[in-house]
Amino acid sequence: MGSDETSTSLLRRIGRRVGRRIGEELAMPPRRCEERYRHELKYLISYGQKADLNVRMAPLLDHDSHARDGSYTIRSLYFDDYWNTAYQEKVDGVLTRKKYRIRIYDYSDRVIKLERKRKSDSWIYKEDAPLTHEQFDRILAGDVGFMEHSEHQLCREFYVEYVSNVLRPRVIVDYEREPWILDAGTVRVTFDMDVRAAVDGFDIFDRTLPTLPVLEPGKLVMEVKFTEFLPQIVRDILPGKAQEITAASKYVLCYD
């Protein structure tokens, strides 16, 4: 874990490599079969900016119905290979990359998802496959043989990477997410608060794991995801400081 100054420096360093101004023309997404890529913008903002944005968004966007109390807790266990490829490619600003994680919500085992997030420039594509609590425990114990012949292609590919590239757990990332949506979810704005790294374990169901904050005090990550184009009414309310645009990676921040 680094200091607040180190975290901020890392965010700005990565942001300079892959960031772009909102007004610039967006690159076309990769075309691979029927995969649906979404554009993703990230900002490092203050809680004061968030309060102002909430007021401006309220007449335009709706709270995501999945957030019963306005927000929910996300806990993700990130994996990386023997060479820490996902980490290194992110820091180096490699435009096309991927990472694996297992994600739960509000510390519950009701929904457990194995996810793979692929990124090409500023476009993202996410795949997921369901897991049971027992299957998660087996993965954590290194028993991944059951995934070799899974009905889910993502599980089979995870198995291959686990065996051939020594894919292993690296860090647990926690944060509180407040989600907003527009046009039935084609535009999604989220505020990720209290981003922290768990230490001393990889069991995502262990609520007693100690955690450490990774952002400087008073800061949070705002994400804007959309397909094809971003409506002008949303563009008009986005943070205006170009230097705040960043490719903040929670995995990189927490792994450090």
Segments predicted by a language model, with ranges:
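Phosphate-end processing signature that detects enzymes handling 5′-triphosphorylated RNA
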Residues: M1-D256
